[in-house]
């Protein structure tokens, strides 16, 4: 057991170039890692903001309703952040469907403004379950917001389009 612990300690020392101050090297590594994570989060937030601005500039209007759709190579958390930022920018008459293709897995994220839920009887959870079938998936959520995953990456664009179709604008 003592030899196993010593071997493990030697392996860790080797990872840190056999430094004499192993504790200090590990603390420095952890601090640098935390700093890099914060920088990545900041970069991702900036990317979401730029993407939001591009999508808003390209939003369609159908019968007075702003329709924002796209397929992007983003993570689920970024997709969620993005649609909520779009909803903040367009608080009324909004239908938004974002397809995500990160890690070669389709993810569909849908958000509606409250007036579309209340006055037009739209339910993102119900609509996304139907649209997700096109990507061999399933999901659900609340009346104003829902996410669905799937297996068929080729179906993500059709699923995004299906959301708009099912909204009956």
Which residue ranges define each predicted feature?
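Terminal appendage regions of diverse proteins
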Residues: 1-169
């Amino acid at each position: 057991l003592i030899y196993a612990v010593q071997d493990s300690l030697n392996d860790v020392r080797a990872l840190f170039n056999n430094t004499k101050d192993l504790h200090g090297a590990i603390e420095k590594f952890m601090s640098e890692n935390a700093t890099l994570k914060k920088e990545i989060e900041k970069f991702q937030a900036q990317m979401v903001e730029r993407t939001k601005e591009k999508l808003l500039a390209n939003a369609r209007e159908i019968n007075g309703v702003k329709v924002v759709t796209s397929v992007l190579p983003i993570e689920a958390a970024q997709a969620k952040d993005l649609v909520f930022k779009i909803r903040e920018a367009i608080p009324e008459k909004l239908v938004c469907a974002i397809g995500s293709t990160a890690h070669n897995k389709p993810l569909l994220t849908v958000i509606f403004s409250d007036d579309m839920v209340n006055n037009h009887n739209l339910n993102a959870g119900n609509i996304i379950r139907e649209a997700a079938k096109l990507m061999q998936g399933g999901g659900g959520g609340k009346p104003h917001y829902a996410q669905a995953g799937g297996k068929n990456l080729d179906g993500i664009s059709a699923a995004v389009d299906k959301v708009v179709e099912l909204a009956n604008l």
